[in-house]
C-alpha cells in the first residue's frame, strides 16, 4: 500500500489539455508552504535586525547586506534553476533547494562574524530559496489555465501567513532562548520544503488521440479533400483563374512557400517540414530577450524589487525609533502581512475575470503602491504607521502574487515561453535585489532617520510604473511592424517566404493576369 502511494506521487501526470485542477491542487498546497518557508522567512528576518547589530556591533547597511546578498543570489541564479528543472525535473530541484535553505540557516546560527552570515544565509540559503521557489511557481502555472491567476494568488498568501505568525512568535522565542537558537529552530523548520517538494509531480500535455490515430485521420481528411477539391476548384477557376493540383498525401502542418516568377504565372510550391514541436527544446530560451515587451516588463521587475523587501526589513526599526515598543512594532509587520493576504486574493479574483487587460490592472496597483511607500515618510506615530502598513501590505499583495504569472499572458511572452521567461525575469531582478536594502540602509546611516529608507523604495517603484506602462505599447508596436514586413514580402514576386503562418498569407484571386499553380509535395 505504501509503495503504491509512493508510486502515485512519483509518476508524471499526462493530460490531453491543461487540467485546471486534479493534482494541481496538491501542487498549489505545496506552493503555499514553500512560500511560507522561503519568502515568509525572508520578510520576517527584520525581527533579528537589532539583535545582529548589537551582537556584531555593525551598522544598518552592513547588516542589511545579509538579506541583500540572499535576494541577489535568489534572483541571479534563476536561470540556473530553470536549466536544472528542465534537465532533472522540478521535484528534485525543489528538494535540493530545501536542503540548502536549511543548511545555510542552521550554519548562520553559529556565525561569529557578519561575514559568516553573508556566506551562510546570503549564498547558501539564497541559492536554496531560488531552487525552491522558482520551479514550484513554474509548475503550478502549468497545472492551471483559466484559474491560474486566482490559484496562484491564493497559494502565494503562504508568505503573508508566515510573516503574521512568525514575527510575534520569533520575538517571543528570542526572549526565551536567544536569537541564535531561534535562528537554528527556523533552519530546522525549513526542512519541510523537502517534503512539499516531493509532491511536485511533472505534467505532460499531449493531444487527445495517439499519433497513429491522428495520422490515419489526417490521411482520411486529405483523401476527402482531394476528392472534393476537383469540383470546387473547377468552379472557382472560372472566376479567379486559379488552377490547383494536390498530391495524394496528407496535408502538411507546417509550410514553407516559395514564389517563382513565370511569364504569366506564379507557382507556389508547398513543402512539408518537421513540426516545430518535434525539435528538441532548449534548456533556456534566450529569444525572449528580442521581445521589447519582455524587456520593459523585466525592467519593471528590476525597479519594483527596490520596494519589495526594504519595507518589511525596516518597519520594526522604524517603529522602535518613533518610541513604539518592540511588541507593538512587530504587530505592524503582522498587520502588513494580513493586509497582503487580502491584496493577493483580491487581485486573483479581479485578474481571473474575462475579458480583462491584466497588465492595466497591474499598472494601477503599482501606482498605488508607490503612493503607499511615500506615505511612510510622513508617519510619526503608531496609528499612522498602522495605516501605512495596511495600505502598503494590500497593494504589495496585489503585485507580489501576480507579477510572475503575468509573464504567461500574451501581452508579455505567453505560456509557451513561461519557464524561460521566469528564469530570465528573476535573474534581471537580481541587480535591484542586491542594491535595494543596502541603499536603504545607507540613507538611514547618513540621516539617522529610518523613514528615509522608504524614499529609495518609492523612487524605484515609480520607475517600475513607467516601465510597466510601456509593455503593452511595445507589444502592439512589434505586431504592427511584423504585419507590415510580411505585406512587403508578399507583394514582391520572386521572393522567398519562409515560416509564414497561413493566416497571414493573402492572395488576390480576382486578378486574371496571374494564374497560381499550387502543388503539394510529400515529405
Swiss-Prot record:
Localization: Basolateral cell membrane
Positions in the Cytoplasmic compartment: 1-21, 84-91, 140-149, 206-299, 352-358, 403-423, 474-523
Residues annotated with Phosphoserine modification: 234, 237, 240, 247
Catalytic activity from the UniProt record: taurine(out) = taurine(in)
A GO term, aspect molecular function: monocarboxylic acid transmembrane transporter activity
Gene3D superfamilies, alphabetized: MFS general substrate transporter like domains
Membrane topology: Multi-pass membrane protein
Topological domain ranges for the Extracellular compartment: 43-62, 113-118, 171-184, 321-330, 380-381, 445-452
A GO CC term attached to the entry: plasma membrane
UniProt KW Transmembrane keyword: yes
Residues annotated as transmembrane: 22-42, 63-83, 92-112, 119-139, 150-170, 185-205, 300-320, 331-351, 359-379, 382-402, 424-444, 453-473
One of the protein's GO biological processes: monocarboxylic acid transport
Claim: Transmembrane helix is one of the keywords in the record: yes
Entry-linked Pfam families: MFS_1
Superkingdom as given in the UniProt entry: Eukaryota
UniProt keywords, alphabetically: Cell membrane, Membrane, Phosphoprotein, Transmembrane, Transmembrane helix, Transport
Matches recorded under InterPro entries: MCT7, MFS, MFS_dom, MFS_trans_sf, Proton-linked_MCT
Subunit structure and binding partners: Forms functional complexes with BSG/CD147 or EMB/GP70 ancillary proteins.
Entry similarity comment: Belongs to the major facilitator superfamily. Monocarboxylate porter (TC 2.A.1.13) family.
Function: Monocarboxylate transporter selective for taurine. May associate with BSG/CD147 or EMB/GP70 ancillary proteins to mediate facilitative efflux or influx of taurine across the plasma membrane. The transport is pH- and sodium-independent. Rather low-affinity, is likely effective for taurine transport in tissues where taurine is present at high concentrations.
Protein name: Monocarboxylate transporter 7
